[in-house]
């Protein structure tokens, strides 16, 4: 659970009405732009957002800025989309969608996605490719998030017990980054030990929380099993009762993790969640579990009626009923994962591009316009990949709307980018 209360964060609880801030006129050079030598102009020069706490800025947010953003989501009743990315192209689509919707976003990498980011031609013994891919992706996000002018929580997804060396490698990278910049490379990590006994799950989470707290990082932990299949993990045959978390289990997590100084954490509590998309009626979500858990834990903590001490994560958001999504947000969900639907949207963009230009994609030379006409501009990968990105942006726009996460930044509509490089002799198509 995200430690948004004074007990869990070790900070004074913020008032429900967060102060509005105007946009400063000074140009901001963030650590990524400064370190990489990327000019910080246009959207990147935004110092703060009219509708968000002053600490929240363009680029990757960590520590107190991340907490302020998530606290704002809970207070105002929106959740932030968390999208699994496997290439720089999918990262860029997420950033574009966030700017178009005037909203923050969570970009996350799974172990398999991280390995793919590094390239399947790289050996993954001891998870070295997965570690390298995640770190490479993190630097790309840091470089480009500022340019798009949106705040990003940089996260990694399901880390089961057998994947702990992958997490250790990323933590080491964050420790080195923290020593140089005063903040971690990643904002947060997820530990998924839901298939382990509860006591072992909690013990390992406490161990990692202690290490992460020293860098102001957030830990997402999972209770109960998310069904379905994702990233090579198949839980399609799990017992139905294991898909639903009990309030008492969440309380055990709360007690253990809040004892760690500077602890920041969220809970991915199972309430019937399933990875993937299934026919209507096959998935039975019960968001009421989240509401009952809030009441139970608030009572245990002696908090006023109506308090939501837990910040929940909604796994398996693809294909979920909009009514279940809206209800879950009212019970304290501040993050919803989406992967299957964005995988489909990316592929569908390529599929539709191929269908539209099929007759221009069969040979290098020769098409309906003439046997001697070249087809280079059609099979240039930038064309089909851009179609995939645009399709993904469209799907994510729906996700932002479903999560009440539109206009959160207060910047207004995004102006259309100028993508023309100008006339050049011998230029490639742009």
Model regions and ranges:
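A post-motif C-terminal structural segment
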Residues: 321-323, 327-383
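Extended, intrinsically disordered, low-complexity segments
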Residues: 355-430
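Catalytic cores of alpha/beta
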Residues: 162-170, 318-331
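Alpha/beta enzyme core
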Residues: 64-72, 88-106, 110-127, 136-149, ...
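Glycine-rich beta-to-alpha transition loops that act as phosphate-gripper elements at the mouths
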Residues: 85, 154-160, 308-320
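Divalent metal-coordination and catalytic microenvironments
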Residues: 84, 94, 157, 219, ...
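N-terminal amphipathic alpha-helix/helix-capping segment at the start of soluble metabolic enzymes
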Residues: 37-81
């Amino acid at each position: 659970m995200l430690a948004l209360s004074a007990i869990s964060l070790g900070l004074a609880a913020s008032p429900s009405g967060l102060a509005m801030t105007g946009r400063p006129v000074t140009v901001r050079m963030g650590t990524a732009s400064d370190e990489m030598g990327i000019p910080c102009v246009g959207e990147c020069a935004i110092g703060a957002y009219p509708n968000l706490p002053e600490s929240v800025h363009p680029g990757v947010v960590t520590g107190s800025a991340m907490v302020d953003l998530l606290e704002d989501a809970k207070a105002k009743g929106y959740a932030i989309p968390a999208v699994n990315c496997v290439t720089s192209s999918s990262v860029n689509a997420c950033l574009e969608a966030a700017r178009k919707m005037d909203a923050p976003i969570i970009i996350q990498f799974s172990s398999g996605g991280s390995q793919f980011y590094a390239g399947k031609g790289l050996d993954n013994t001891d998870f070295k490719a997965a570690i390298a891919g995640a770190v490479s992706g993190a630097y790309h996000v840091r470089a480009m998030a500022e340019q798009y002018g949106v705040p990003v929580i940089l996260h990694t997804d399901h880390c089961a017990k057998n994947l702990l060396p992958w997490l250790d490698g990323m933590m080491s990278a964050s420790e080195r980054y923290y020593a140089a910049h005063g903040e971690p490379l990643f904002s947060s990590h997820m530990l998924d030990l839901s298939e382990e006994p509860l006591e072992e799950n909690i013990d390992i989470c406490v161990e990692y929380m202690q290490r992460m707290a020293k860098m102001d990082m957030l830990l997402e932990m999972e209770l109960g099993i998310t069904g379905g299949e994702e990233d090579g993990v198949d839980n399609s045959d799990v017992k139905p009762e294991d898909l639903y978390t009990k309030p008492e289990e969440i309380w055990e997590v709360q007690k253990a993790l809040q004892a760690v100084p500077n602890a920041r954490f969220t809970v991915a509590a199972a309430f019937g969640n399933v990875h993937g998309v299934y026919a209507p009626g096959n998935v039975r979500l019960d968001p009421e579990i989240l509401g009952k858990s809030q009441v139970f834990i608030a009572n245990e903590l002696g908090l006023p009626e109506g308090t939501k001490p837990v910040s929940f994560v909604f796994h398996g958001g693809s294909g979920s009923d909009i009514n279940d999504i809206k209800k879950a947000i009212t019970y304290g969900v501040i993050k919803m994962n989406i992967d299957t639907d964005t995988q489909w949207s990316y592929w569908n963009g390529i599929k539709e591009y191929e269908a539209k230009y099929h007759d221009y994609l069969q040979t290098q030379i020769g098409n309906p316009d003439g046997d001697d006409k070249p087809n280079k501009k059609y099979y240039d990968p930038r064309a089909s990949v851009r179609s995939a990105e645009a399709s993904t942006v469209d799907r994510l726009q729906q996700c932002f709307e479903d999560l009440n996460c539109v206009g959160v930044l207060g910047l207004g509509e995004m102006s259309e980018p100028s993508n023309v490089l100008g006339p050049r002799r011998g230029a490639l198509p742009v």
